[in-house]
Amino acid sequence: MNELSFIHLSDIHFVKSSNDPSDIDKDLRDAIITDLEINARENLKNVAGILVTGDIAFSGNIEEYEIAKEYLNRVCDVFHIKPSDVYCVPGNHDVNQNVVNSSDLIFTAQNAVDEKGTIDDADKTFSKYISDNNFNALFKPIDEYNEFAKRFECNISADKIFWQKDFVLEENLKLRVVGINSSFLSNKTDHQKGKLDRLMYIGQAQIPCYETDVATLLMCHHPPQCWKFKDNILPRINKRADIQLYGHMHSQSVEIMDENAILYSGAVHPTRTVDWLPRYNWITISSKTENEERILKVEIYPRCLTDDRDSFTIDSTCSLGENHISHEINLDRKRKAALQDRKKETLFKDEIELCTQSTLVDQTSEPIDERKIIYDFYEISWIDQIDILTQLSLITKETSTKLDSKMISEAINRAREQEKLLELHKKTLNKMEENV
């Protein structure tokens, strides 16, 4: 059985003072590392990545992400996986509210989407604003998040409003991890005294698509109770996203339905109130065949800090006293129930067409590790990046003085198309050696 395991963290809320001598949260982060070394390695066979469902930073500042990167590297080191094996989505704390508060244009764009009464009108307005090449108002507040996330290929833009990554299971199945953004509209009016929290916008373009032989794991910061137009979105999400991971609420629960496994994660760094209890999770996913139907098996291991705050242990209140929660989803039966009225030969045509517009798909047949190549490239200096791209004729000397992050990403895509990624990586490693 080809099992895939993941470590799931949420709401870490790194601040600039994290790891300072007076940082009282450092001990609990170290306790997570110890729990992974002693208990996770004993229970999990094949850790494929680290999943982070938002609020990586506290204020969306670059210094906070540098600290986050160092910690996530430590988590990866426990399982001897690459530092690029991190998958993340932004939360409301990953939005730099100073950027929003200082720009009437951003605030106006957010409110223009927020005030729409139907999801179709909201989607139309959203599309209008993200198509503005002069000033992309709805992405500007997460510039620092994108600088951090680009090394994992989890950055988002008008050209890629969600990301996805494929893993291989048995029974001719792939596990597709999809990361969507629920924080486009986040601003100072999210939480106002005496008012209900503002609802967040998730457009129809972020709903995962159907595809043959694919099981979907969805990552999103805000859970469905925080969504605008939930009644329009959630039924389709439930049909298409078999496993769903959420953060934001800082309270942990697992919802098991016949056709879904949904994890509402607690926070690694919750606010220190009377019910303060840090939590995180392990997840194992595998597949099998029964009666010629393919079954997706999901195991969730909820973890929480012990009462004496000394270490992490089984979250028995969430797992009903067991080591983990186990659930099986009959994928073939679920897909048939959702789609049986459609002709087999055209079953996924429309959705696959939508997917190709903004995919980040791992091509398992390729002999190179694209994620590591891109991660390493973003670890070298801006000057070295420009030098390499110029040497490989991926940019011109004339454009090198005008480069921004988007143009760098486009140059990397050209390296893919021109089959120059291996050469780019070789030059990247040479730069790293020169700078040691």
Spans of model-derived segments:
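N-terminal active-site segment of His-dependent metallophosphoesterases
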Residues: 1-67, 71, 79-86, 96-98, ...
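Active-site-proximal beta-strand elements of phosphoester/diester hydrolases
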Residues: 3-18, 174-186, 217-220, 262-267
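Active-site neighborhood of phospho(di)ester-bond hydrolases with catalytic His/Asp-centered motifs
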Residues: 8-10, 48-55, 81-92, 216-225, ...
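Active-site environment of divalent metal-dependent phosphoester hydrolases
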Residues: 15-17, 57-60, 90-103, 187, ...
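Active-site-proximal segments of metal-dependent phosphoesterases and phosphodiesterases across multiple
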Residues: 21, 182-246, 254
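Extended active-site neighborhood of metal-dependent phosphoesterases/phosphodiesterases
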Residues: 69-192
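Conserved beta-sheet core of the metallophosphoesterase superfamily
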Residues: 172, 224-298
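A short C-terminal boundary segment appended to hydrolase-like catalytic domains
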Residues: 287-431
